[in-house]
Amino acid sequence: DAVEVHAGHGDLISQFLSPYTNHRKDEFGGSLENRMRFMRMAMAEVMAAAGDDMAVLVKMNTRDGFRGGMEVPECIEVAKALEEIGVHALILSGGFVSRAPMYVMRGAMPIRSLTYYMQQFWLPIGVRIAGHMMIPTVPFKEAYFFEDALKFREAVKLPLVYVGGLVSREKIDMVLDAGFDGVSMARALLNEPDFVNRMAREENARNACEHANYCIAR
């Protein structure tokens, strides 16, 4: 029924968009308009292939989450460009996996679990020693992208899906009441797959996910 194109988190489209990774001197680098060129070309192909039979959603950053990356004003311009292209909805996230991974997820990364599948004998040792410096903790708070996402709600008219730290019906209602058209959850549903049904029954439903990130590390 739908396809989601990932244009955030340091994936390929995000690497073209971000001045942190895009150092090109040709028509694909430099100004924001040039850095958006690859995205426009890719999305034109996606929209043509989807036709009238499939919804096209794009996950994108509200900001990269570190100095030298994209900030909210530039990301809003990206959102406006995607609206102009005709995508059907945006999923608003943030962070850059290779540079600011915990800005995406928040909380601490359980380093010992992260090394579980590393086969070279020396690699787990090094990661366990320096892991917390390599992947610094970013404090978790519920609905942690909400303030930035509100600025996008004011700037564009297309449907917006909020993602980021939703673990209670109270906060989900807050997001929907603010004009967002949907929400996305991951860790909360890994912790409790039936959580959406429980929220329908319980006004004060809250998920027990502690955002310990063991599901990410393993």
For the regions a language model picked out, list residue spans one by one.
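Flavin-dependent oxidoreductase catalytic cores
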Residues: 1-218
